[in-house]
Amino acid sequence: MKKILFGLLITATALMAELQQVWATPQFADKNIKIIDIRTPAEWKETGIVKGSYTIMFFDEKGNFSVESFLRQLNMLVKKDEQFALICRVGSRTGMVSEFLSEKLNYKVINLKGGIMKMIHEGYKTVPYKQ
């Protein structure tokens, strides 16, 4: 009986978490889904950003982070039940952050695999970052 209950709990938890893994493509930028760029300001300046995206740094240049600060800014942009996408340089940081947001906090997250570098490689023209 305990095994059945444990199995049901795991299944229910998996169903609640809504994490999608999608390749970052120029076509994705045309969708009507908010894109949150979690890179650093230096990275935003270096490559530019996706047009219409929102910039909220998660990890700073030294790898430090503040979940509270990030969530405060995120919650000003998206509703808890609203689907949104995360992008970083190549998808490593967003892989970790999107999994955390989805599995621990039940956000509806799309991880843009390959990041901004994949989009640029496929011909996407970023816009300059303005503070």
Describe these PLM feature segments.
Residues 5-17:
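Hydrophobic h-region of N-terminal signal peptides that target proteins for export
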Residues 16-31, 41-83, 92-131:
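Rhodanese-like catalytic fold shared by cysteine-dependent sulfurtransferases
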Residues 86-88:
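Short, surface-exposed ligand- or partner-binding patches at beta-edge/loop junctions that are enriched
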Residues 35-37:
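Structural scaffold elements adjacent to functional motifs in cytosolic proteins
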Residues 1-2:
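N-terminal hydrophobic targeting signals that begin at the initiator methionine
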